[in-house]
Amino acid sequence: MDIILGVVMFTLIVLALVLVILFAKSKLVPTGDITISINGDADKSIVTNPGGKLLSVLAGSGVFVSSACGGGGSCGQCRVKVKSGGGDILPTELDHITKGEAREGERLACQVAVKTDMDIELPEEIFGVKKWECTVISNDNKATFIKELKLQIPDGESVPFRAGGYIQIEAPAHHIKYSDFDVPEEYRGDWDKFNLFRYESKVDEDIIRAYSMANYPEEFGIIMLNVRIATPPPNNPNVPPGQMSSYIWSLKEGDKCTISGPFGEFFAKDTDAEMVFIGGGAGMAPMRSHIFDQLKRLKSTRKMSYWYGARSKREMFYVEDFDGLAAENSNFVWHCALSDPMPEDNWDGYTGFIHNVLYENYLKDHEAPEDCEYYMCGPPMMNAAVIGMLKNLGVEDENILLDDFGG
């Protein structure tokens, strides 16, 4: 009898707790449709169910806000102004938003929970962002760890981007084996040396990442990207490999790939100042886009130079492109510096890190380095070294332009 009574009491307690939870949910969790008002324009308003983050809710309604990290809160690009309904700003947002900006309603869309009616403001250019399903034309190694992905835009469509701009790529959930990658024999030495073919990328949900264009606007009908494979660091091989770069490296001719855009803010200034471009690794992409745009589309007569850092001759690419531009344009020169040339390279050009090479062979004796405009994209260590060198030369922040995720 005591056992039966105990079971009954336990059951009643469980039922009571369930009822309490259901009651609390009915009071605390919003239900029914909510309205997101945008820019005070009724035609742009979104009616949706509560739940999820503002970034994904907007994307689900065809409003694509830039987010280089795919909504992880690390890039700080998905800024919107929330006038009401966004709740309190989160600590994760304060890494990217100042207290003054927060008082004005600045928020990260990826961190704002959609719980109630909201009133937000978005830049008008966001409504020009579109989504396309593209076809892979080619996906070839340009260096040991860099592929050039070339995508065909659907017939009759165009991506109205500016040089230095970027698009976002969507990758579905996937299980990709590095052993299936198409890596030409000339590049396989390092892959075998570091046992990279053992890695696999397992992703359980769709992801989005941003990549800068390597083509310029008058290379019509295509999108061209330089994508470095993000392998685990040698000192921590158990870290998962890069999700998006693994997906992109797996793409083959004829595959479909979804992109959205265009986005961007890494644009050239409309001045007559000298332009100095500095790149490394996959940071080649926006440098190529900018330089081709200046010389081929704009027919610019501005003095400009390009300084690219690579490890060895095998890691140099687009050499013929830039040699051709230099031969055709007396106002343009370019230089490559190798940090670790191989004996078979027979290299007689510049050696060392690109910031040192640029300083020792050009800026040290430049009559006014502070008057130049510097456009750079490369690995974080390169960017930091170049910026430090420029600061020591007295270059102001407004003349240092950085693409911070192309490398």
From Swiss-Prot:
It is found in: Cell inner membrane. Coiled coil: none annotated. Residues 272-389 are annotated as: Catalytic. Its EC number is 7.2.1.1. GO terms for molecular function: 2 iron, 2 sulfur cluster binding; electron transfer activity; metal ion binding; oxidoreductase activity, acting on NAD(P)H, quinone or similar compound as acceptor. The keyword Transport applies. Residues 129-269 form the FAD-binding FR-type domain. This is Na(+)-translocating NADH-quinone reductase subunit F. It comes from Vibrio anguillarum. The lineage of its organism: Bacteria, Pseudomonadati, Pseudomonadota, Gammaproteobacteria, Vibrionales.
